[in-house]
Amino acid sequence: YMGLLEIVKNENNDLNKINSLKKFCEVELGKGAIICNDTPGFLGNRIGVYAMQVAMTEAFKMKLSIEEADAVFGRPMGIPKTGVFGLYDLIGIDLMADVLKSFIKELSDKDEFQIVAKEIPLVKKLIDTGYTGRKGKGGFYRMNKSGDQKILEAINLETGDYSICLLYTSDAADEQQR
């Protein structure tokens, strides 16, 4: 499912064995294997979660809708087509909160991650009420079943209320900027 595989090494590892493992993972498993030092958080999480948290924080500051934020901070920034908020829903809002807490605890107070790893009240409210993403009642997006219809709804970051989701593309976001 995921293309990236991180092999964590330390000073006690035999580098020949590490390199053999890397080659096996690339050739036999088809993974993009990288060798990392043992530090808090996987490399993918250090980069990806940081970028997602910055995007989320900026969306709140800029008073964007989640649809606008996902169009702007999604594909154009290398995030999957779900966009940032959709990706939070896919991963699990509660799991992302746990990852953030882990980083806050394990990383130095001077680490740049600490600046953006603050708890967001709406995120806490979503988790507390069972809106943990796709595995729960919904998250930033939810599917509202009305009779035979399924209506995709998006949460308003300011009010916490849901309304019918407006789909934006990065082209549409560019147009709105003009």
Question: Regions from the language model: what does each represent?
Answer:
Residues 16-17, 65-68, 134-135:
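A short alpha-helix-loop-beta-strand transition element characteristic
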Residues 46, 51-71:
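Rossmann-like dinucleotide-binding core of oxidoreductases
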